[in-house]
Structures are given as structure tokens and as C-alpha cells.
Amino acid sequence: MIDFGNFYSLIAKNHLSHWLETLPAQIANWQREQQHGLFKQWSNAVEFLPEIKPYRLDLLHSVTAESEEPLSTGQIKRIETLMRNLMPWRKGPFSLYGVNIDTEWRSDWKWDRVLPHLSDLTGRTILDVGCGSGYHMWRMIGAGAHLAVGIDPTQLFLCQFEAVRKLLGNDQRAHLLPLGIEQLPALKAFDTVFSMGVLYHRRSPLEHLWQLKDQLVNEGELVLETLVIDGDENTVLVPGDRYAQMRNVYFIPSALALKNWLKKCGFVDIRIVDVCVTTTEEQRRTEWMVTESLSDFLDPHDPSKTVEGYPAPKRAVLIARKP
């Protein structure tokens, strides 16, 4: 059973303590609910991983842990087998004692695009909404954050995060909670809030922006990354049944329309800091994610379009401030 007690003890002593009025009951309810059919297998994989404290830990340039002496072939094989039990691995990569987890997404590329535009993360308390396996949280810690809290209801991602955390020496500077943003009270407690790859999955995107704002302290910074299309401030794509084979894509605005949405929600100092087309080098099938990936979702005769005929995925990063 994954234990959240360390997180409760941690926030009991800081400005997130008021979260304890609701959080333990929510987590207890989650633990009582019907778990995914493979959850026991996943949590066992975490449990059977060895307790290792890294001799060298690099979270600034990557997520890399190394031991003072090389692990035996048997130890490496054990780690690799258990981590493969947690496939598919979508967000990464991770390099853990000679086991290189080549994930579907090169999330390090996204981080390299975002990082130069952020306010200094040193000492900050951060919320990462829809954090997946938690890759970016470890990079936030590497960039100096005091505490990174991720929320994502996907149970596999929770187990992937806990597996990586265990191999990083049970590092307590990052925590993942199996919750959605709609389950959080208006904490108004985070210096920086990240929402990357979430907005287009929300039926009400403006409500999502308000929810993000409710988590920020005054003068806090929002980092928003999402799918966009070309166009002016009035351009929004509402896909039909699917977009790039995804059923749960509701609104894809232009970057300028998204800027207006942020303004409408009361954000200020709104900047479009990056816009780029997603390539099949950044998102692709690997040995750690063996099912369909981006190349399967694009028109084989015209990769500038999805298989449904929409513009191929393009992503923008916007940064804004809560006054």
C-alpha cells in the first residue's frame, strides 16, 4: 500500500497545513475505492525494488541516479524487470543505475523549452497538474524548488512515480497525489503552478484556468502548455469524435485566443514564450512504450495533418501572473 503519511507530516509544518482539513479523507476514500485491476501488480513492483541511496544524483540536467560501485548484473536485471512491469512509460527519460528508461515522450526537450522563461524556482512550492510519472517534478527540484506536488488520478503514474522516488533514495522533495484538479480546495498556496498537456482534455477550459488560479498565491506564476492551432484571437478548433486518435480532446485554441482566455480569467503579464510542432522524434514508440504513438496518428501521406484531417499537433507555452 502506498503511504501518504510522509506528505501529511510535511505539510503539517508549512503553509499547506490547511489542506489537511480535506486531503486525508479524500485519500482514504481513494484507497477504499475499486482499484485498477493491475494496481496490485504495479504496487508490488514498487515494493520489490531495492532500497538504494544514490551516490550521484543529477536532477538539474536529467533524472539520473548512479551508485558509487556499479551494481551487479543481477541487481540491474531486477530493477529493469520491475520497471518494465510498470509499462507503458510515457514521460521521461530516466537513467537509474544503468537502467535507461527511454519513454514515449522526450519530456526533457519540453523542459528545455520551458525552463529559460520561468521565474527562478529556487525555494518555491510548486503544483504540477496532470503530472504523469512525475518527470518534470524532479526537474523542478533540480532547478531549486523547495517542494513539488503533483496531482494525477492515473494509478499507473502514481506507481511509476513511487518507483522512481524509491530509486532516488526515497527523496521527499516531490510528492504525487492521485487526485484531479477539481478535487482540490482553493489553496492559494503555490508559488508556481504548471498545467502541461491538460487543457485540451477539459470540457470547460476556462473553468480549468480558474481552478489553476485558485491554487496560486498572489503574484504567483502560471505555466500553461497545451495544443494550439494557427489563427487569430477568435480561432478555436472543436474537433469531432477524435483528434489524433484521442477521444477526449475538446477545445484547441490559437495561442492568441488562449492569451485572451487567460486575460478573461484575471491573469496579467501574459506571454507566449514558445510555439512548436510536435515531431516524431519527440513523441515515438520505444521499447518502454510499445503501442501506437504520434507517427500512427498522422496522415501517412501528409504529416502536417492528423489521420482525421486536422492540423498536426502544435504546442504553445504561455506564462502568466496572478495579481
UniProtKB/Swiss-Prot annotation:
Keywords: Transferase, tRNA processing. Carboxy-S-adenosyl-L-methionine binds at K91, W105, K110, G130, D152, P153, T154, I181, E182, M196, Y200, R315. GO terms for molecular function: transferase activity, transferring alkyl or aryl (other than methyl) groups. Its EC number is 2.5.1.-. CDD domains: AdoMet_MTases. It catalyses: carboxy-S-adenosyl-L-methionine + 5-hydroxyuridine(34) in tRNA = 5-carboxymethoxyuridine(34) in tRNA + S-adenosyl-L-homocysteine + H(+). It comes from the Bacteria. InterPro entries: CmoB, Mo5U34_MeTrfas-like, SAM-dependent_MTases_sf. GO terms for biological process: tRNA wobble uridine modification. Belongs to the class I-like SAM-binding methyltransferase superfamily. CmoB family. HAMAP family: tRNA_carboxymethyltr_CmoB. Catalyzes carboxymethyl transfer from carboxy-S-adenosyl-L-methionine (Cx-SAM) to 5-hydroxyuridine (ho5U) to form 5-carboxymethoxyuridine (cmo5U) at position 34 in tRNAs. This is tRNA U34 carboxymethyltransferase.
